[in-house]
Amino acid sequence: MKVGERHYHTIWLNEDGRSVDIIDQRWLPHEFRVVTLKTVADVADAIRDMWVRGAPLIGVTAAYGVAIAMAKDPSDAHLDAVWEELNETRPTAINLRWALNAMREYLRPLPEAERADAAYKRAAEIAEEDVELNRAIGANGLDVIREIASKKKPGEPVRILTHCNAGWLATVDYGTATAPIYMAVEEGIPVHVYVDETRPRNQGAYLTAWEMNGHGVPHTLIVDNAGGHLMQHGDIDMVIVGTDRTTANGDVCNKIGTYLKALAARDNDVPFYVALPSPTIDWTVQDGVKEIPIEERTADEVSFVQGRAADGSIASVRISPEGSPAANPAFDVTPARLITGLITERGIATPSPEGLKALFPERS
């Protein structure tokens, strides 16, 4: 996507052929910074501390982390050690483990002398595959927006609620939940996006709103608790979110608060869609509530908020009393029964084992 007059991916290989650059998302929307990752420790920090975030982008970043590791030490022991180190950074996003497995399975049969170059080649392929998957997701989701738009009066926008950031900043490009929105805008379909702020890290306010601004998409930032009210009053035509892990039966694990949006959507007959590339599907898990590990993040993310101060500096301020404990589960699980459809690169699946296997028969 474009930032100013330049087209960016969220991650790219440097001219030295070894280090990678990323957009450091901790500073958005106030500052646009690019940082270089040169070591596995850099990559682990970037994933764990959310310099990069979003399940697809985490996976691609980890793939490049393996490549960086192979350039230093291509042994089996180092390959396994790096797999373990990076896999522990974010436990919920399945794309992380998928990418690490893809890299290890590709590299293991190769002679050690060939592994470094092969690793960078495979990581670049995973990055490009992500772009193509998201483009296909966008085309399939666009059909849903077109259908809703066809029932509107001329010029009346399709009103879309989204939660967290499943935009191009969460992937290499296009995004998952935002890809259909961007394609609708490019096609001339009027849309208006309601952006949940998404506490506690405010990815909606910081990132999705920044994306919408940059792409010229009409949007309104709302507090997390306003979505149900808007649905009650007929102000939302559809909800579309991303996912960090989707089970074989169609349960969806996404940013905390997604489940409440799905409940409100069901109560108000608002279609609730989830956009995802197939590497986000965990075919080994059936019951998302019981089986998916939920990352617990630091209490400081709840007790403090970051923003731009009056003097222009970026400041973090406490918003809760000293000594008040805070819980910070990063994700929740939305049961398949609350989901209208799963928008994948192969089409829109009904959220069920049968629906997913119809699109992915190789998993039967």
UniProtKB/Swiss-Prot annotation:
<dbReference type="InterPro" id="IPR027363">
    <property type="entry name" value="M1Pi_N"/>
</dbReference>
<dbReference type="InterPro" id="IPR037171">
    <property type="entry name" value="NagB/RpiA_transferase-like"/>
</dbReference>
<keyword id="KW-0486">Methionine biosynthesis</keyword>
<comment type="similarity">
    <text>Belongs to the eIF-2B alpha/beta/delta subunits family. MtnA subfamily.</text>
</comment>
<dbReference type="GO" id="GO:0046523">
    <property type="term" value="F:S-methyl-5-thioribose-1-phosphate isomerase activity"/>
</dbReference>
<protein>
    <recommendedName>
        <fullName>Methylthioribose-1-phosphate isomerase</fullName>
        <ecNumber>5.3.1.23</ecNumber>
    </recommendedName>
</protein>
<keyword id="KW-0413">Isomerase</keyword>
<feature type="binding site">
    <location>
        <begin position="53"/>
        <end position="55"/>
    </location>
    <ligand>
        <name>substrate</name>
    </ligand>
</feature>
<feature type="binding site">
    <location>
        <position position="90"/>
    </location>
    <ligand>
        <name>substrate</name>
    </ligand>
</feature>
<feature type="site" description="Transition state stabilizer">
    <location>
        <position position="164"/>
    </location>
</feature>
<comment type="function">
    <text>Catalyzes the interconversion of methylthioribose-1-phosphate (MTR-1-P) into methylthioribulose-1-phosphate (MTRu-1-P).</text>
</comment>
<comment type="pathway">
    <text>Amino-acid biosynthesis; L-methionine biosynthesis via salvage pathway; L-methionine from S-methyl-5-thio-alpha-D-ribose 1-phosphate: step 1/6.</text>
</comment>
<feature type="binding site">
    <location>
        <position position="203"/>
    </location>
    <ligand>
        <name>substrate</name>
    </ligand>
</feature>
<dbReference type="InterPro" id="IPR000649">
    <property type="entry name" value="IF-2B-related"/>
</dbReference>
<dbReference type="GO" id="GO:0019509">
    <property type="term" value="P:L-methionine salvage from methylthioadenosine"/>
</dbReference>
<dbReference type="InterPro" id="IPR011559">
    <property type="entry name" value="Initiation_fac_2B_a/b/d"/>
</dbReference>
<dbReference type="InterPro" id="IPR005251">
    <property type="entry name" value="IF-M1Pi"/>
</dbReference>
<keyword id="KW-0028">Amino-acid biosynthesis</keyword>
<keyword id="KW-0614">Plasmid</keyword>
<feature type="binding site">
    <location>
        <begin position="254"/>
        <end position="255"/>
    </location>
    <ligand>
        <name>substrate</name>
    </ligand>
</feature>
<dbReference type="Pfam" id="PF01008">
    <property type="entry name" value="IF-2B"/>
</dbReference>
<feature type="active site" description="Proton donor">
    <location>
        <position position="244"/>
    </location>
</feature>
<dbReference type="InterPro" id="IPR042529">
    <property type="entry name" value="IF_2B-like_C"/>
</dbReference>
